């Protein structure tokens, strides 16, 4: 059995590595961040995997205990049966058979682990996650963000930044400890239990909120994914926002490099800060920094100024890289979705991908046909069936949470399955794995989509920064134990009977040591998940935002908006330029190296397929009928259309601001929802009558003028069409 247990841990380690590899690369972030995050993820996932095994082992030990306690009675019954004394009683025979069957059913589970070993493993993983969450990850996050040029300086700064927080916690902990010793007269073990109860209470609050959102959003997002026209419309709307975000990030990077240029110009040779300035300059993207001819600022260089500037540059490069990838990924998703829609009328039964390599080999044709069948006949049905299955699982979990309040009788479906089924049945073992696995999926997937002021955000294809992955690991560790404790609660495996308590419950201890929390808190607080689910189902968050004049558009198949038309034009234009210039998406390239403040190697973050625009001979553009055509594609000085459009838009925007003298009666600003939004993209709403919808966020003020109709991403482009403008002014909110 120990071999199976080791195999399970190896599988958990591989799973942790696979998921972690989706978001970060060892080449991109410091090695110590990668290892510490991997350890935290591994211990958290291991706790989730071990709990179902723990439940099976506990049920097996309980069965053996009952069988052993009745062994004498069983022997007497067997003797009576052999002598024929009870042959006339059918009821007694039925009872005898039931007892014998119960005895025979106590078979050892396929992954049985002794109670002592499980408790030791739980203690190691649980207290390891506590250490990482409350000590290692906060210090490491501050260390990674520090702009100091020496190791000692970065360590000192990270300790100082966290010292205030630890001081507050220390004072509160000291007061509580004195109160527990003086008033409650608790011993050391009880105080440790109190600390665990406080930590688990905070974790349980997070679990209820995140899981409540995920239980509704997971099946709904899968159902919405089957409506391709709606998804494409949302991508068109989102492309404009991402283009604006990309421009802002690039402008911040250029502004930072201008400050660096000014300091470099004023720094003389053999200056004591020259080596630090060289480190900062070497981190700037070479091609972009070469275009910065004149600096800005006072140019005064002190150590504190250079430290702050180094940190600012690292953040600017990270944000620019992130914005570039998100915009690129949005375009790729739109291109692929258009290719799938066009393949429906394909006579050769093949999906003609615009930006994918064609398959090669003897089975290439068959694989292409199978792929075409999947996208045109199977995918939509599979998505809808999966959405229905997940919706049923969500209802099962919500009912189990609701059943916790009924302590006098057991109405939990999962609890009754565990109690009245044979533990050796492999089907029952999988029944235990699936609900907890689905809980972890809904909770963790919501955590991975969280973005706090666009600062902590996990980006797939290894484009996440170190601080975001540390933040996710810290909260992942906080959620593991409370999630499992809640699962054990609603299957009634946490009673006070020693033989009926799981090893996990023994390690976690009782929660009665916290008087203002107590057992009732863990029974009735999960009922709030019903409120969270209903709020998510009926889009209460969106309605609150609308009341605050932060418009959230409800996307359905009939929804139309000027920004969707603009995004459609943008995506079509980018498709032509990608095709002409043979541009490949960022997701197909390896991520850039890490931004280490102590390194002197230049860092390049932009696509290798892009080249710079020649100022002497920029590409010629013909604008007619809403199309932009590049007539200089064969010129050696021609760059990618994306780089030219960005520079063209920036120049046009500056001209527009100068011509209007900043007297425009409106102000246009397209924003991301930078609140604690759960979704990596935009929230999904329900449009009523069974029609799912998307949310998109648009600020309430818009910019326009008498001589120009400005649209986000293309401030002056409508002036070139002559005649009536294609896009009308958006109404002021």
From Swiss-Prot:
- Ranges of biased composition (kind: Acidic residues): 674-685
Q: Which keywords does this Swiss-Prot/TrEMBL entry list?
A: Coiled coil, Membrane, Transmembrane, Transmembrane helix
What do the Gene Ontology cellular component annotations say? Answer: membrane
Its membrane topology = Multi-pass membrane protein
Signal sequence coordinates = none
- Sequence segments annotated as region (Disordered): 581-641, 649-668, 674-696
Q: Where is the composition biased (Polar residues)?
A: 596-619
Give me the stretches of Low complexity compositional bias.
620-640, 654-664
Q: State where it is primarily located.
A: membrane
Which Pfam families does the UniProt record give?
Answer: LMBR1 (PF04791)
What are the transmembrane regions? Answer: 1-21, 33-53, 125-145, 163-183, 191-211, 386-406, 423-443, 468-488, 513-533
Any coiled-coil ranges, and where? Answer: 232-266
Lineage, top-rank taxon, reads: Eukaryota
Looking at the keywords, is Lipoprotein present? no
Asked if the Swiss-Prot or TrEMBL record annotates the protein with the keyword Membrane, the reply is yes
Q: Where does this protein reside within or beyond the cell?
A: Membrane
Family statement: Belongs to the LIMR family.
Report what the protein is called.
LMBR1 domain-containing protein 2 homolog A
> What is the phylogenetic placement of the source species in the record?
Eukaryota, Amoebozoa, Evosea, Eumycetozoa, Dictyostelia
């Amino acid at each position: 059995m120990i071999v199976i247990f080791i195999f399970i841990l190896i599988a958990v380690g591989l799973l942790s590595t696979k998921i972690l590899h989706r978001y970060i690369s060892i080449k991109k972030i410091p090695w110590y961040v990668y290892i510490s995050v991997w350890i935290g993820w591994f211990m958290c996932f291991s706790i989730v995997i071990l709990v179902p095994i723990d439940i099976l082992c506990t049920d097996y030990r309980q069965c053996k205990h009952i069988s052993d306690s009745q062994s004498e009675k069983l022997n007497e019954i067997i003797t009576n049966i052999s002598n024929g004394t009870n042959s006339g009683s059918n009821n007694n025979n039925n009872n005898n058979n039931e007892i014998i069957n119960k005895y025979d059913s106590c078979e050892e589970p396929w992954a049985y682990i002794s109670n002592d070993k499980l408790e030791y493993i739980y203690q190691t993983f649980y207290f390891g996650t506590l250490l990482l969450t409350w000590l290692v990850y906060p210090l490491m996050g501050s260390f990674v963000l520090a702009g100091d040029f020496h190791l000692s300086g970065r360590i000192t700064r990270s300790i100082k930044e966290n010292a205030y927080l630890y001081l507050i916690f220390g004072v509160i902990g000291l007061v509580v400890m004195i109160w527990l010793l003086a008033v409650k007269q608790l011993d050391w073990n009880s105080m440790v239990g109190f600390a665990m109860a406080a930590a688990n209470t905070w974790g349980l609050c997070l679990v209820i909120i995140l899981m409540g959102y995920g239980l509704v959003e997971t099946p709904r997002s899968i159902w919405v994914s089957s409506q391709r026209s709606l998804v494409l419309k949302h991508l068109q709307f989102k492309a404009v926002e991402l283009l604006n975000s990309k421009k802002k990030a690039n402008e911040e990077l250029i502004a930072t490099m201008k400050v660096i240029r000014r300091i470099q110009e004023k720094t003389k040779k053999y200056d004591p800060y020259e080596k630090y300035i060289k480190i900062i300059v070497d981190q700037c993207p070479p091609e972009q920094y070469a275009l910065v001819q004149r600096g800005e600022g006072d140019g005064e260089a002190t150590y504190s100024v250079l430290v702050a500037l180094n940190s600012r540059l690292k953040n600017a490069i990270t944000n620019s890289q992130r914005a570039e990838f998100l915009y690129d990924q949005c375009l790729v998703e739109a291109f692929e979705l258009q290719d799938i829609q066009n393949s429906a009328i394909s006579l050769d039964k093949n999906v003609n991908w615009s930006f994918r390599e064609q398959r090669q080999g003897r089975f290439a044709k068959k694989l292409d046909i199978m792929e075409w069948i999947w996208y045109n006949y199977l995918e939509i049905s599979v998505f809808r069936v999966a959405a229905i299955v997940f919706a049923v699982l969500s209802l099962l979990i919500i009912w189990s949470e609701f059943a916790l309040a009924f302590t006098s009788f057991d109405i939990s479906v999962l609890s009754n399955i565990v109690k009245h089924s044979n533990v050796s049945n492999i089907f029952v073992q999988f029944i235990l794995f699936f609900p907890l696995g689905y809980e972890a999926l809904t909770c963790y997937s919501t955590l991975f989509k969280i973005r706090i002021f666009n600062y902590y955000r996990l980006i797939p294809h290894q484009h996440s920064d170190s601080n975001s992955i540390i933040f996710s690991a810290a909260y992942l560790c906080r959620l593991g134990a409370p999630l499992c404790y809640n699962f054990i609660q609603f299957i009634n495996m946490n009673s006070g009977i020693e033989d009926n308590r799981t090893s996990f419950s023994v390690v976690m201890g009782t929660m009665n040591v916290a008087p203002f929390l107590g057992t009732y808190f863990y029974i009735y607080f999960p009922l709030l998940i019903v409120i969270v689910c209903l709020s998510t189902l009926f889009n209460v968050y969106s309605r609150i935002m609308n009341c605050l004049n932060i418009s959230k558009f409800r996307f359905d198949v009939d929804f139309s908006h000027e920004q969707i038309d603009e995004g459609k034009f943008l995506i079509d234009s980018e498709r032509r330029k990608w095709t002409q210039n043979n541009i490949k998406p960022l997701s197909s390239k390896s991520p850039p190296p890490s931004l280490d403040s102590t390194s002197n190697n230049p860092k390049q973050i932009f696509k290798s397929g892009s080249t710079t625009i020649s100022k002497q001979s920029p590409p010629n553009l013909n604008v007619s009928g809403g199309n932009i055509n590049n007539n200089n594609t064969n010129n050696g000085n021609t760059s990618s259309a994306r780089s030219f459009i960005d520079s063209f838009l920036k120049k046009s925007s500056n001209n527009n601001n100068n011509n209007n003298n900043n007297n425009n009666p409106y102000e246009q600003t397209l924003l991301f929802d930078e609140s604690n939004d759960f979704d990596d993209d935009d929230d999904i709403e329900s449009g009523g009558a069974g029609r799912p919808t998307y949310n998109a966020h648009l600020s309430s003020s818009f910019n326009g003028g008498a001589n120009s109709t400005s649209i986000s991403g293309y401030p002056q482009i409508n002036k070139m069409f002559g005649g009536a403008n294609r896009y009308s002014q958006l109404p002021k909110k």
